[in-house]
Regions:
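Accessory beta->alpha helical hairpin/"wing" motif in late/C-terminal subdomains of nucleic-acid enzymes
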Residues: 63-81
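Ser/Thr-centered flexible coil motifs
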Residues: 20-21, 68, 94
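Terminal interaction helix/tail motif
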Residues: 88-131
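Basic amphipathic alpha-helical segments that dock to polyanions
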Residues: 48-62, 71
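Short amphipathic alpha-helical interface segments
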Residues: 2-51
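Long amphipathic all-alpha helical oligomerization modules
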Residues: 78, 82, 86-90
Length: 133
């Protein structure tokens, strides 16, 4: 429930910033250094990606088909706002409960990610992955 609430909050912030789903994929891709994969993996075709980049460029968030420093800053701001708005749920859950919960689910998550890597490849489930160098 907490995870879904965080996702819903994240989408609400994206909407409030007038960032489309394709633009969100492009910004997230740049943040994780995925090489242009995320927006396509979420169903955006070349035309939608081109239009999304044009919209980002008109706002100074991209230049020549590359997300700019300003675009990365907006992506980070959205993440920070999401964290700020959703931290209360974890605080009310408490540190001890959170640690017990993480100790229980992290091994399952690690096995799931290994299975995804083995079957679908290392690009799937970008939200569950660390930023690439």
């Amino acid at each position: 429930c907490i995870r879904e609430w965080r996702g819903d909050t994240h989408f609400a912030i994206l909407t409030s910033e007038d960032i489309s789903r394709v633009q969100a994929g492009i910004l997230h891709d740049a943040h994780l250094n995925y090489g242009g994969w995320i927006a396509q993996s979420r169903g955006a075709d070349a035309e939608a990606i081109t239009q999304a980049f044009a919209d980002l460029e008109s706002r100074g968030l991209a230049q020549d088909g590359v997300v700019s420093t300003a675009g990365l800053a907006v992506r980070e701001l959205i993440e920070e706002r999401t964290n700020e708005l959703t931290q209360r749920a974890w605080q009310s859950f408490g540190l001890e409960n959170t640690e017990r919960f993480l100790n229980m689910v992290e091994p399952i998550g690690e096995r799931l990610m290994k299975r995804i890597d083995d079957t679908a490849g290392p690009n799937w489930m970008p939200a569950a992955r660390e930023r690439r160098p």
